[in-house]
A protein has these predicted regions:
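Alpha-helical transmembrane segments in multi-pass membrane proteins
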Residues: 45-53, 68-80, 97-102, 106, ...
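Hydrophobic alpha-helical transmembrane segments
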Residues: 44-47, 67, 71, 222-236
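N-terminal signal-anchor module of multipass membrane proteins
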Residues: 2, 6, 14-77, 84
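C-terminal ends of transmembrane helices
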Residues: 78-90, 126-137, 231-240
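Membrane-interface helix-loop-helix junctions at boundaries between adjacent transmembrane segments
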Residues: 97-98, 103-174
C-alpha cells in the first residue's frame, strides 16, 4: 500500500523561496532487512536439514514411518496446489515452503498412525493453518503443528500409540494400524512402547542419556533422532539461515529451570539433560 503524498512547505527567510517536498512512503510485510537469499533458497536448505532426520526415522521405525512421511508430504502438496487453482493463483508448491510443512507435520506424528488420518491432518494443516490466514508469511501458527493439534483433538487414542523402534520386522511388514480403513477402529501391533516423557510422568523413570541422544526410545516419527536434529540446526546456523542464539537460549533456559526443580525433588523432576 502507498500512503498519500505528504506535502510540506518550507519558507526560506529573506528570499521568499518556497519548496514543496513530496515523499512517497510504502508499507510492506516483513522482513524489511534481508540477507539477499531468496525464499526458495532458504526453504530448500531447511528441507536439506530435515532429510537426515527423515532418513533416521525410516531406519528406526521402518516402512510405517516412510508411508506416514510420504502421505504427509503428498497431502500437503496436493492441498496447496488445489487451493492455488481454486483461487486463481499460480501454484506455490515449487517454493519449498509447503514441502517443509509436509515434512515437519509428518515428523510430529506417531509412526503407526493410519494413513487416512495423516492425509486428513495434512489437508487441515495447509487449508486452515496456512491458506486461511493468507498464505506464506501471514499464518499466525505453524501449519504443521496446526495439523497435529487437529489430529490430537480429533483422534486422541490413535495419537498416543507409539511403535517400538528398531523392531526386527520393521522393513519386512507394514503395521496393521497404518493401513486401517477410514473411520474404522485401527488394530495396533502388540509391541508398543511408552515415550520417555510418559515414563517420567507416570512411572518416574528417566531414560538414559545415550538412548535419548541416539534415538533408542519410542516417540513421534522424527523426535527421537536428537543428534541429527541438532546437526540440522547447526547446518542452518552455519549457513546464516538460523540465529543460533534462539535455540541455544531456549535449551539453556529449560535446562536451568529443570536443574532448579531437580534440586527440590530429584525423583519427581527430570535432570537437565533429559529436558
Amino acid at each position: 500500500a502507498v500512503l498519500p503524498f505528504v506535502e510540506t512547505h518550507a519558507a526560506q527567510t529573506g528570499c521568499g523561496f518556497v519548496s514543496n517536498l513530496k515523499t512517497s512512503l510504502e508499507i510492506g510485510s516483513s522482513p524489511h532487512i534481508t540477507s539477499g537469499a531468496s525464499v526458495d533458497v532458504i526453504m530448500r536448505n531447511v528441507v536439506y536439514a530435515l532429510l537426515p532426520v527423515c532418513a533416521f526415522a525410516v531406519y528406526a521405525f521402518g516402512i510405517g514411518a516412510a508411508l506416514v512421511l510420504v502421505t504427509a508430504l503428498a497431502s500437503c502438496l496436493a492441498t496447496e496446489h488445489v487451493i492455488c487453482r481454486m483461487t486463481g493463483k499460480k501454484s506455490t508448491t515449487g517454493d519449498w515452503s509447503v514441502a517443509i510443512t509436509g515434512l515437519l507435520y509428518g515428523l510430529t506424528l506417531p509412526p503407526g498412525l493410519p494413513l487416512w488420518m495423516v492425509a486428513v491432518g495434512g489437508v487441515f494443516a495447509v487449508a486452515v493453518g496456512k491458506a486461511l490466514f493468507g498464505g506464506l508469511g501471514y499464518h499466525a501458527f505453524n501449519p504443521a503443528l496446526v495439523g497435529r493439534a487437529f489430529l490430537q483433538a480429533a483422534f486422541p487414542q490413535s495419537m498416543t500409540h507409539w511403535s517400538l523402534p528398531f523392531a526386527d520386522d520393521r522393513f519386512t511388514s507394514i503395521p496393521s494400524s497404518v493401513m486401517a480403513f477410514p473411520f474404522a477402529e485401527p488394530v495396533y501391533d502388540a509391541v508398543t512402547a511408552a515415550t520417555p516423557l510418559a515414563q517420567m510422568k507416570f512411572q518416574s523413570i528417566q531414560a538414559e542419556n545415550p538412548a535419548l541422544l541416539w534415538g533408542l526410545t519410542a516417540g513421534s516419527t522424527g523426535e527421537t533422532g536428537f543428534a541429527l536434529i541438532f546437526l540440522g540446526g547447526a547446518y542452518l546456523a552455519a549457513r546464516n539461515m538460523l540465529n543460533w542464539r534462539i535455540p541455544i537460549s531456549i535449551m539453556l533456559t529449560a535446562s536451568l529451570i529443570s536443574w532448579v526443580f531437580m534440586q527440590i525433588d530429584p525423583v519427581a523432576y527430570p535432570r537437565p539433560a533429559f529436558t
